[in-house]
Each structure stands twice: as C-alpha cells, then as structure tokens.
C-alpha cells in the first residue's frame, strides 16, 4: 500500500480505496471477537503507517471495513468460513451469513468495530470516507430492505460518535438499485465494469439527478478477467472525470497495473495519469463548481465520436473521444464539427492531446445567439478542449 500511495502521489493522484479483509489489512481475526482487545494489532499498526504516509503525500483513503464475501458461503469471493461471526469459529455464534444483518448481538458488536475504526483513524485528514460494506447486496440472502435498515442504523451510529464528520457511503455491484442513492449516504459510490463508456455516463447522469457528489470507486473493462492496458484505464479515467464524477475511475486491477512497464521501463498507466491530474488541478484551482453540459446543449456531428463535458465559471471543457478508443482502436478523424451552448462573446478554442498533455491547436471563435461552433481536425483516440 505504501508503494501504491507513492506512485499515485508522484503522478498527481490523491485518493485510493482500501478494503479491510483477510486479503490485505484485516482487523477482524477468524478466532477473535469484535472487541478492542481482539482486533489484529499488527494490521492495525500497519494501517496507522498507511494513514501517516497518506497524510504526508496528500492522498485520501476510502476505507472499506466490511465486504460481501465475509457474509457469503458460496461464490468466488466467499470468506464466510474465516469470518469471526461464523459459529464454526472460536467465538462465532451465527449459523448462516444472512443472520449477520438482523442479529442484535452482531449489530452491537459491529458497531463496536466501527467505533474502534472511528476512534483510531477518524482523526486523519486522509480519511476520505467510510464505505460501510463493499457490494453489500452481493452478500448471501440479503434483501435491499434489510440492507437499507442496517445501513441506516450503522450510519446513524457513526454520525453520533464521529466528531470529525467523516463521509459515509456504501457500494453495490449494480448501479440499478435504490440503496446506493439513499439519503443516509453522503455521496454516491458506483461500481462499473464495461466496454461501453456510455454506461459510465448513464450511471453518472442517474447520480447527478440525486444532487449528490458521485465517485466511480471500482471500474474495469470486465469483472471476470483483468483486461488492463493504457487504452482501457485512460478512457475510463477521462470518461469518469469529464462525464461528471468527482474524480477518475478507480481501477479494480491495480496489482496488474502496478506490474506494467513500457520499453523504457516506466509504468505507462502512472505516466498517463499525470496528464489528467494536471488538467483537473488547473480547473480545481478556480474554486468554481462544475456544471455538466447536457446533451441538448452539445452536438458532435461526427458519427464515430462523441463529446461530453462541463462548464466552470465562464469556461467550458469538453472531452472528445472515438467511440472505439476503449478497445484500443481509433480512426483518424479528419474533421469533427462541434457546437456547444455558450454565452455570446469571443472565445479561444484550445485542443490538448490527453496522452501527452501537448497543445494541438488554438483558434479564436465567436459565440452568437447562444451557440459556438468549431471544428477539431486530424485527431485520434481522444482530445480535451478548453473554451
């Protein structure tokens, strides 16, 4: 984790997501209890070090204390056999995973677990949020009603004890559920695996209708295999940020990303991240809110490409992309005609290469009758446009 934080921060990134589980850092031991004296002190101390280093590097952590596999006895992610609440283990008392969400003793003990997390890590400026449970609705036998009741009870408890008012969220494997949009959460947490960028935009638009911040905190080309390359991560990151998420899309396949090198021995994903983080910081420095440009106010007349973007102050920012770029394919677009709604006046249209950060062109244009029209010539893959 320290190496991940270093590489992310060195290239301008500022947030990560960490599960507390048997796969990495875990506070709940199989043969322990959900009480202060039984939490894994070695892993807790390591997490202390992770938070200290994150604070030094300006990186924020979305902390996930529970995950669905802990409460599933079947499936690829099952971890019920090692769950401390399982009756087969030393202090366990639940016969089935489904009981966890409604058993009063289990709820009392898990509140103690969250109290411990708040007490030990809630002070940190690097704690972005507490995600109550990863993909909670993938837990065995749980219903959305039960999940909603449990989340409300636990989030209410955390808010009672957390003087630092850390953000609270939850995640689901599907964005087509009311739970993740619940008013008991501070922001919307989306997981999206797809070879279609349009699904990213659909998720974001649904979230924006709730008038809450939205973060794509788990993403990939496929949930069943690690399809990891620059084209996939690049397009999903830019699609998330330019489409209206508060940041880029957080790839699930970070170990595979970490292992990538180019012919010069550098990591192409980290290098590519730099151009998006530089661009986003430029906008962030304005201190002004972003307003998504709706499709009724933006037209791309090139049938093989699409554009999304937002306004910030008097400026607009568009991401123009080839519809097949996520698959590593792209035509050379000789001329793409764009029209976007803007207040009347004179503007400079600046086009940047998102893979290098280089300025490709700059032209003066005038908006009249509430619209500005311009062309982007001889481009491929994707470009970002500043108006």
Regions found by a protein language model. Give the residues of each.
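Catalytic-core region of carbohydrate-active enzymes that cleave or remodel glycosidic bonds
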Residues: 53, 59, 182-258
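Residue-level structural signal for beta-strand termini and adjacent loop
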Residues: 133, 364-365
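Active-site flanking residues adjacent to catalytic metal/cofactor-binding acidic residues
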Residues: 134, 217, 385
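Aromatic- and carboxylate-lined catalytic core of secreted/periplasmic carbohydrate-active enzymes
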Residues: 222-224, 233-363, 378-387
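Short, surface-exposed tryptophan/glycine-enriched loops
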Residues: 121, 375-379
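Residue-level signal for short, function-critical loop segments
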Residues: 67, 136, 220, 322-324
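Short strand-edge motifs at loop-to-beta-strand transitions and within beta-strands
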Residues: 370-372
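Active-site mouth of glycoside hydrolases
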Residues: 1-186, 190-199, 210
